[in-house]
Design a protein with these regions (language model features):
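Active-site-proximal loop/helix of nucleotide/amide-processing enzymes and allied scaffolds
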Residues: 121-124, 128-133
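Signature for HUH/AEP ssDNA processing cores
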Residues: 1-106, 116-119, 124, 138, ...
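Conserved short beta-strand edge segments in small beta-sheet-based binding/regulatory domains
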Residues: 130-148
Length: 196
């Protein structure tokens, strides 16, 4: 008997009967299918090719999900981090409890993916947020969505998953997004007051 056998280093993981365990590759494939499900078959194939070739494809908003566009200045003020440092990404993951966020480094923006209903159910908040350059992209908008494995800032790609989408239909909770916006607005106001 080897020392590995006696120490249990290679023992199989025991699961409870009836528990189905999905591999990361299975979750990623299911998430890709979910993201592309708003497209026709022909457009779906073109989107897959764009992901492979360019690392990004445009997907329609307002059916499966919408996106709240957040200026980097507001996100950085709310989190206290530095843009593109990785710490903001980590903090967003905590704040949104793993809800997916896309970062557009060139545009200095983040996109929190939220339920498709947000533009209809939060109209007053959205009107208030526009003064702070926050916009909700619903029906009629398209969002450039990176390939699921692009999870770090890389000059080779236009955008990346600041907080990766862990599985299909997992989205940010609108209330958590609203709280981040409120914290960012407050922090920016405090900075402006201190600069006077």
């Amino acid at each position: 008997m080897s020392s590995e056998d006696t120490e249990g280093a290679r023992r199989p993981v025991q699961t409870e009967p009836g528990v189905l365990v999905h591999s990361g590759a299975d979750r990623r494939l299911a998430t890709e299918h979910w993201l592309l499900s708003t497209l026709t078959d022909r457009k779906r194939q073109a989107a897959r090719r764009e992901w492979e070739r360019n690392g990004i494809t445009a997907l329609p908003m307002g059916t499966l999900m919408s996106a709240v566009r957040l200026p980097a200045s507001l996100v950085v003020a709310a989190t206290g981090g530095r843009f593109l440092s990785g710490e903001v990404d980590r903090m967003l993951g905590e704040i949104f409890e793993g809800g997916p966020v896309i970062c557009d480094p060139g545009g200095h923006r983040y996109y929190a993916l939220v339920p498709a209903s947000v533009p209809r159910t939060w109209p007053d908040a959205l009107d208030d947020w526009r003064a702070h350059e926050v916009e909700c992209l619903g029906k009629g908008y398209h969002l450039c969505v990176p390939r699921l494995d692009i999870t770090r800032h890389d000059e080779a790609y236009v955008s990346y998953w600041s907080v990766p989408m862990p599985s299909m239909a997992t989205l940010c909770t609108p209330l958590r997004v609203a709280r981040l916006i409120a914290a960012g607005v407050h922090a920016l106001g405090a900075q402006a007051g201190a600069d006077r």
